[in-house]
Amino acid sequence: MKPKLTVLSLGAGVQSTTVALMGVHKEIPHMHHAIFSDTGWEPQSVYDHLQWLKPILEENGTQVHIVSAGNLRKDALGENPDITRVASMPIFVKNPDGTKGLLRRQCTLEYKINPLMKKQRELVGLKPRQRWKEEEHHRMDLVMGISWDETQRMKDPNVPW
């Protein structure tokens, strides 16, 4: 069995950057890996910040992985001929009765969470569709930065790490 890993879910915002730098400064345990899930449609400031942060993490022993499920903007605009359906984005719409509504959000799952999960499984040595054995649970600690005003986003994981 592989040794236990500590992996940061890196959004390159304030919270995950703070956690990453706390690891660099040894205020919290070392993180072996950091994973950034690129939608292809992040603000330029996020890419600039990631370009600044990545070498700091790598110089301190944290391997940074950039994963992607494609370019959300191009997929949504139909610019990718290989895409037959696009995950819905939280876009404001006008309903047939004239009321305002919000489309259901699927893009976070398909363009952020699924690529992160795929990389996490790879890091712990699981092949596609391979199941965990009970004695192999808890091979990874996943670290996420969530501020106090976002505690409603915290959930128990649906995976055994």
PLM-predicted stretches and their roles:
Residues M1-W161:
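ATP-dependent adenylation/nucleotidyltransferase module used to activate substrates
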